[in-house]
Amino acid sequence: MKKLLKSALLSAAFAGSVGSLQALPVGNPSDPSLLIDGTIWEGAAGDPCDPCATWCDAISLRAGFYGDYVFDRILKVDAPKTFSMGAKPTGSATANYTTAVDRPNPAYNKHLHDAEWFTNAGFIALNIWDRFDVFCTLGASNGYIKGNSTAFNLVGLFGVKGTSVAANELPNVSLSNGVVELYTDTSFSWSVGARGALWECGCATLGAEFQYAQSKPKVEELNVICNVAQFSVNKPKGYKGVAFPLPTDAGVATATGTKSATINYHEWQVGASLSYRLNSLVPYIGVQWSRATFDADNIRIAQPKLPTAVLNLTAWNPSLLGNTTTLATSDSFSDFMQIVSCQINKFKSRKACGVTVGATLVDADKWSLTAEARLINERAAHVSGQFRF
């Protein structure tokens, strides 16, 4: 049985190292009991059943570095089934689009192309009886998200009638032939959790853990790449809780009523894992169930534009003449995409369950170094180093 357990753990660790990497780290279930001697103070092996034992024997502290690097979190859009905007244009005649209609939301359950999240933090754990850890991390995180333009509700107004765009005109086309990507700044992040060695048999340990993490970075750069509306905004600002039509000064540098684009990241996780100690090396394999959300309050960001036209243009949108050879002077804005905007929707985990493989290297029962890979619900790697006081 012991040989079989060794083989299974080593095979899983090898497969994880050569496969793809991917929620929060599960960690080694043996962590609470690996470092039994202190770097500064000598460790005490307290027995909770000993009537002479004190809390000084029961409690110890560990600290170290915590690095978690998610290369591809599998996310989808959390949005309603309908989206309120102008009616879909039909035929070749221009028209005014001032009445809102509920149309099928192209962002509903849309899958994202890529989502990355990187965290570097300090780690501190309160250990009880060399069996249970209560820990927290304090550090900084930054991220990157990319998806089809429909996942961000990229919309615009096309084929509008008249020599001006009225303040009550609504966007009438959803732009699907594009990509939207955003980069966040590096912001403070924290997490709390608990881990316990629930069952031990010889060199094998079965444990469980729970974690919660949070961060609130601002969007540093927003790039919209589309053949009919292309723009990039540094430190974008937009409108939260504002329905169409957007204010007439939307996109102008001096626009009022805008707020910074901030993403509220939350994640919780529960997991279980099994380890087997081989001298100084402790490989482990585990499973985890996690839920992550990235919520920007559905902020809507307008394409940057000039307050007044220069060379008859307010934004760098191409003309879309189609089969028309002459411009209709009565419909000055009909062949240019107007009032373009995108919305940073709420994103959430598409897959909840994942598999974890990793190993811990222990030195003198005082120091340890852990490397971990996570699969299925994300591709991620985790490294940590810690010592016992």
Curated annotation (Swiss-Prot):
The keyword Repressor does not apply. It is found in: Cell outer membrane. One of its GO terms (molecular function) is structural molecule activity. Keywords: Cell outer membrane, Cell shape, Disulfide bond, Ion transport, Membrane, Porin, Transmembrane, Transmembrane beta strand, Transport. The keyword Disulfide bond applies. Signal peptide: none annotated. It is a multi-pass membrane protein. One of its GO terms (biological process) is monoatomic ion transport. InterPro entries: Major_OMP_Chlamydia. It comes from the Bacteria. One of its GO terms (cellular component) is cell outer membrane. Belongs to the chlamydial porin (CP) (TC 1.B.2) family. In elementary bodies (EBs, the infectious stage, which is able to survive outside the host cell) provides the structural integrity of the outer envelope through disulfide cross-links with the small cysteine-rich protein and the large cysteine-rich periplasmic protein. It has been described in publications as the Sarkosyl-insoluble COMC (Chlamydia outer membrane complex), and serves as the functional equivalent of peptidoglycan. Part of a disulfide cross-linked outer membrane complex (COMC) composed of the major outer membrane porin (MOMP), the small cysteine-rich protein (OmcA) and the large cysteine-rich periplasmic protein (OmcB). This is Major outer membrane porin. It comes from Chlamydia pneumoniae. The gene is ompA.
